[in-house]
């Protein structure tokens, strides 16, 4: 009986919803931030979903490279959509609450797509390595079946990693404050709110995040080191310039993405600054998904040619 009373008392004090404090509590900034992030989100959807449609309808783009790009666009649109709409609503609404299960769902889907993007970027580096290092063997090294398996593995790994993090985070007790000092449900602010011992969670998160990010970064670095060596051996100066141009834009995007992830999740817990982290979070949840279609695709001659053809046929 005593145990039942303790459990009942604990359940009465446990948190059933959270309050997302958002980016700023200054009411004068709410409207400006809403308009700005709405425009960015719309550009994100147009760019990424447009890229998916373009690759789908143009037969010339039905190759492994563009299958990867299409998957990346889907992931960018998805992980931004798991955060941005709720952020936009909270910028204009007085009630900034999110239910316990809603917070868990947002946490899971955001983590799934973010993890999937890490793996996809590594797979795309391997794809570029195979295409430049040995073009004759490229159809064998990255066949349609292998491409599908690489992408499916990326999604499964991302979802599995997010499931572990979500299960470990939301099994904790939240019986004190329910005010999340962030604009979405993220790991550091949630762990700070928990009244359970979060030491083990911190170790597991650090271990999994370190393994995923470092292994993906190593694949990218090794792939591009091999690409760099292969490009230097090219007899054509024009071919070298084209290859270096493609690699430079890709490496810039990878550096921005993994740099922000490393900064956010692979630091000691004691060094977290919520205000600083919110700014960095805006960068990789809102800005990077908009930049990726430009960096990866719109600088590509095949994509621009396909886009002109579609516009000429259906609009002009």
Curated annotation (Swiss-Prot):
Main localization, broad class: membrane
Cytoplasmic side: 56, 126-135, 232-245, 300-316
Any one biological process term the GO annotation gives: G protein-coupled receptor signaling pathway
Residue numbers on the Extracellular membrane side: 1-34, 78-104, 157-210, 267-278
TM helices/strands, residue ranges: 35-55, 57-77, 105-125, 136-156, 211-231, 246-266, 279-299
SUPFAM superfamilies for the chain: Family A G protein-coupled receptor-like
Biological role stated in the UniProt entry: Odorant receptor.
UniProt name for this protein: Olfactory receptor 5AP2
Lineage of producing organism: Eukaryota, Metazoa, Chordata, Craniata, Vertebrata
């Amino acid at each position: 009986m005593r145990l039942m009373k303790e459990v009942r008392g604990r359940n009465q004090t446990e948190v059933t919803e959270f309050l997302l404090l958002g980016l700023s509590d200054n009411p004068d900034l709410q409207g400006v931030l809403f308009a700005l992030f709405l425009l960015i989100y719309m550009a994100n959807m147009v760019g990424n979903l447009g890229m998916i449609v373009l690759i789908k309808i143009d037969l010339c783009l039905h190759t492994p490279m563009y299958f990867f790009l299409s998957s990346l666009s889907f992931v960018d649109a998805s992980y931004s959509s798991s955060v941005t709409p709720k952020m936009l609503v909270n910028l204009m609404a007085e009630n900034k609450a999110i239910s316990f299960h809603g917070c868990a769902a947002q946490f899971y889907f955001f983590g799934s797509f973010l993890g999937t993007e890490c793996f996809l970027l590594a797979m795309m580096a391997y794809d570029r390595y195979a295409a430049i290092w040995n073009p004759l063997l490229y159809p064998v090294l990255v066949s349609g079946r292998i491409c599908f398996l690489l992408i499916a593995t990326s999604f499964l790994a991302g979802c599995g990693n997010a499931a572990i993090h979500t299960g470990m985070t939301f099994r904790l007790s939240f019986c004190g404050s329910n005010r999340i000092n962030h604009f979405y449900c993220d790991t550091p602010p949630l762990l700070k709110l928990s009244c359970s011992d979060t030491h083990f969670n911190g170790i597991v998160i650090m271990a999994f995040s370190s393994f995923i990010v470092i292994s993906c970064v190593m694949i990218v670095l090794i792939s591009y080191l091999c690409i760099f060596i292969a490009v230097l051996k090219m007899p054509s100066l024009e071919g070298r310039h084209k290859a270096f141009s493609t690699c430079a834009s890709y490496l810039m995007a990878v550096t921005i993405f993994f740099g922000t992830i490393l900064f956010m999740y692979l630091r000691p817990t004691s060094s977290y600054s919520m205000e600083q982290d919110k700014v960095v979070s805006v960068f990789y949840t809102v800005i990077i998904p908009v930049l990726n279609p430009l960096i990866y695709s719109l600088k590509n001659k095949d994509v621009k040619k396909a886009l002109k053809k579609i516009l000429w046929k259906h609009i002009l």
